[in-house]
Amino acid sequence: MVIKSVGIESDKNSDTNERLINYNIEKPQVTQNVSNQLILTTLNDLYNWARLSSLWPLLYGTSCCFIEFACLLGSRFDFDRFGLVPRCSPRQADLIITAGTVTMKMAPSLVRLYEQMPEPKYVIAMGACTITGGMFSTDSYSTVRGVDKLIPVDVYLPGCPPKPEAIIDAVIKLRKKVAQENLVERGKLAQTHRYHSIKHELTLSSPVYTGKYLNSSARQTPPRSLSEATGVPVNLIFEMTKKNAIK
């Protein structure tokens, strides 16, 4: 005697019917092998990926920082793996790397090179002299105190000079910035004033270093704590310091 469950058979039939509906010819089943061969992306991401993988820099070296960048051309660091191809013409470059001191005479040339580069274009400021003027930032009449006064900077790379590893890190940060850009918002984020057109107005002032030290009143009059510690009156100490200064 064989006993069959009617409910179980009906459940099986419903499962088979559901499979036939879901996995028919018009709707093929997506397997794991097929999903591994598909890449889903957008046109914006594809465009950014192509640009960040082929940055063509224009090397603008005016000082000793450029020697550190020249180390990247060798096989030890091999910056070609990032798609960097140095160009000699600004019309073929989309990245300019300023390395070294920027003087007043070189400022118009730098701005002209930047204007000749096609859009979109990026700037990496390499070294302390490029970012703030470095050791030439004080008492210098011929040095630009920061290249961002001339052209917009995307990545600042401090150091005196920065190591080749730091340059690679700056390039990686720039690649991340390029990957996050949007084609629709690029026109809205475009800078209207790319550099300062106002000329430097240098005014004459009294010299800071006159060669005479201890001219301040605090330096000329000894503190009372000194007289109390030595037991000598303040007036006597003041006269002694005055005689030594005359001698």
Curated annotation (Swiss-Prot):
The listed locations are: Plastid, Chloroplast thylakoid membrane
Entry's EC annotation = 7.1.1.-
Membrane topology field = Peripheral membrane protein
Recorded GO MF terms? 4 iron, 4 sulfur cluster binding; iron ion binding; NADH dehydrogenase (ubiquinone) activity; quinone binding
Q: Which cofactor does it need?
A: [4Fe-4S] cluster
Q: Which Pfam families match?
A: Oxidored_q6
Record's subunit section: NDH is composed of at least 16 different subunits, 5 of which are encoded in the nucleus.
Function (record text): NDH shuttles electrons from NAD(P)H:plastoquinone, via FMN and iron-sulfur (Fe-S) centers, to quinones in the photosynthetic chain and possibly in a chloroplast respiratory chain. The immediate electron acceptor for the enzyme in this species is believed to be plastoquinone. Couples the redox reaction to proton translocation, and thus conserves the redox energy in a proton gradient.
Q: What is this protein called?
A: NAD(P)H-quinone oxidoreductase subunit K, chloroplastic
Native source organism of the sequence: Mesostigma viride
* Gene behind this protein: ndhK
